[in-house]
């Protein structure tokens, strides 16, 4: 009996415990990232932002969470109730499940699989189903239009993100996220990370990640001036909160992906003491926050694109550019003898 427990049940209990701990830490982090997003936006507009609940407004996100939970969920009379309530849950669960393969430090990962990048790309692609379900089940024209926009937008920019991943794959020879970080470990520190040799792809990834997560200036799915609140028009209370939570988890996931692919993951910027004394998870968190700051600044200073401009940028600019970079990177690696063995 003891052997059965140690062989079969104990690994399962460990994985469940790791997953619960990761989700709790991630949700608490999301609360403060949401607050930081509002504070950055306020600072750009020369105002103070949330500053009432808690010291310096640090508890504002938790107050908003409590308010949302205590509200009554309103369901439109013509809505498909089951699909309507399932949509935000699908969006949130898919966003959280991507973190199962993301290493936050050396050995700090729930599932260190060899197709980690492919897994994250697949899970992020599936998140569009939550938006489509919400748009269709609401029985309203604004959410339905937003769902159609979301499907087209995500498909358009996932192609570019796929080519970005192929460029990194050519340099590393593996889709394992830990291997990608270790491949950037060199005596050059920050200059040895892939953001420098693959800078055009870093820019393509950054802009495509904005579009993939429906962030400004590509928030056509939630364009207030056109679609009121987009696919969330009919949502309130806890379902609305789950959509917001899923959106910000997806944003942080993309920031973590950018950190791993281009910014060296948990590696220190200078591979010498005292920088090497700092735990890897601290460097990883700082780099994710830097990526999120870039996301927040785009929201604050860049005007929204028109829908036709969004599609043109994805198909006529990023797709040819990323495809050309794949060819160039492959050629340079082959003829310079730098291809991974």
From Swiss-Prot:
Protein name: NADH-quinone oxidoreductase subunit H 2
Catalysed transformations (reactions): a quinone + NADH + 5 H(+)(in) = a quinol + NAD(+) + 4 H(+)(out)
A Gene Ontology term for the protein's cellular component: plasma membrane
Topology with respect to the bilayer: Multi-pass membrane protein
Function: NDH-1 shuttles electrons from NADH, via FMN and iron-sulfur (Fe-S) centers, to quinones in the respiratory chain. The immediate electron acceptor for the enzyme in this species is believed to be ubiquinone. Couples the redox reaction to proton translocation (for every two electrons transferred, four hydrogen ions are translocated across the cytoplasmic membrane), and thus conserves the redox energy in a proton gradient. This subunit may bind ubiquinone.
Pfam families linked to this entry: NADHdh
GO molecular function, one term: oxidoreductase activity, acting on NAD(P)H, quinone or similar compound as acceptor
Enzyme Commission no: 7.1.1.-
Membrane spanning stretches: 13-33, 82-102, 115-135, 161-181, 190-210, 242-262, 277-297, 317-337
Protein's cellular compartments: Cell inner membrane
Subunit structure: NDH-1 is composed of 14 different subunits. Subunits NuoA, H, J, K, L, M, N constitute the membrane sector of the complex.
Key words, A-Z: Cell inner membrane, Cell membrane, Membrane, NAD, Quinone, Translocase, Transmembrane, Transmembrane helix, Ubiquinone
Source species, domain of life: Bacteria
GO biological process: aerobic respiration
């Amino acid at each position: 009996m003891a052997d059965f427990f140690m062989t079969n049940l104990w690994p399962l209990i460990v994985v469940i415990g790791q997953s619960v701990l990761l989700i709790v830490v991630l949700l608490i982090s999301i609360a403060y990232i949401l607050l930081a997003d509002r504070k950055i936006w306020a600072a750009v507009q020369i105002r103070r932002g949330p500053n009432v609940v808690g010291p310096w407004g640090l508890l504002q996100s938790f107050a908003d969470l409590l308010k949302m939970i205590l509200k009554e969920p309103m369901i439109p009379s013509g809505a498909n109730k089951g699909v309507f309530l399932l949509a935000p849950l699908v969006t949130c669960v898919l966003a959280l499940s991507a973190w199962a393969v993301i290493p936050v430090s050396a050995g700090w990962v729930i599932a260190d699989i060899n197709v980690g990048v492919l897994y994250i790309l697949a899970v992020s692609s599936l998140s569009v189903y939550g938006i489509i379900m919400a748009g269709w089940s609401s029985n309203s024209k604004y959410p339905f239009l937003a769902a159609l926009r979301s499907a087209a937008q995500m498909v358009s920019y996932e192609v570019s993100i796929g080519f970005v991943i192929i460029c990194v794959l050519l340099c590393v020879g593996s889709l394992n996220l830990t291997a990608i970080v270790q491949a950037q470990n060199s005596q050059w520190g920050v200059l040895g990370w892939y953001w420098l040799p693959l800078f055009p792809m870093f820019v393509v990834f950054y802009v495509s990640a904005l579009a993939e997560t429906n962030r400004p200036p590509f928030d056509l799915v939630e364009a207030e001036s056109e679609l009121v609140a987009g696919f969330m028009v009919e949502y309130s209370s806890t379902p609305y909160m789950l959509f917001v939570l899923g959106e910000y988890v997806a944003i942080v996931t993309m920031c973590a992906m950018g950190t791993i692919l281009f910014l060296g993951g948990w590696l220190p910027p200078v591979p010498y003491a005292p920088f090497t004394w700092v735990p890897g998870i601290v460097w990883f968190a700082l780099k994710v926050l830097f990526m999120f700051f870039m996301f927040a600044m785009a929201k604050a200073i860049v005007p929204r694109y028109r829908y036709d401009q969004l599609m043109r940028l994805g198909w006529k600019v990023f797709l040819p550019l990323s495809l050309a970079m794949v060819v160039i990177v492959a050629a340079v690696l082959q003829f310079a003898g730098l291809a991974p063995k």
